[in-house]
Amino acid sequence: LHQTPFTQVCHRLEQMFNVKIVIMNDKFIGKKFTGEFRFGDSLESILEVIRITTPFTYEREEDTIILK
């Protein structure tokens, strides 16, 4: 991923992990992400890597991830 809008990153993660990601914080609007995910990485480990550059908290409720 190179300069990919955060919303597109979330959409890709939704498809990869069969979850719904709800963005509750406007700070994500306009954010871009450059990085690489490896096959076999867990959703939680990917979210932790993203949190390094864009601090946020998240909750998991069954198949829904809420980003705050």
Where in the sequence are the language-model features?
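A residue-level detector for the "anchor" residue at the start of short, highly conserved motifs
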Residues: 1-68
